[in-house]
């Protein structure tokens, strides 16, 4: 069975009802959760927490609410994190490709998806992952 991984853009949109992509992100997330095969790269949870607690008013939520929302949604899913040696390999891979700045976070998320053997990475920002494409994880924007 091929499993889906999600990135931060899908998690934030799925959890915040006011988001313009809420319906499609929520449907994709619920589909993965219902199938029992959803993979969540660990850095996605930290980044989602960061985004949700720094949004401009009135959309910002408190740290406690962010933790509760993430916990209620993802406590029982498979979290994928890199080991120290895998982090060093990721940094070398980024350096070889001259990828810098925020691209490192996208690379970290994709590396976690690969480690979990995800067939697809669901994202609302597909273009952010295109330069990483090595054909082993399909980059997919959730359907309308």
Predicted regions and their residues:
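Short active-site oxyanion
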Residues: 34-38, 76-78, 115-120
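Short beta-strand scaffold positions
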Residues: 6, 39-40, 81, 104, ...
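Acidic catalytic patch
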Residues: 17, 42-46, 74-97
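Alpha-helix/helix-capping structural signal
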Residues: 9-10, 43, 108, 127
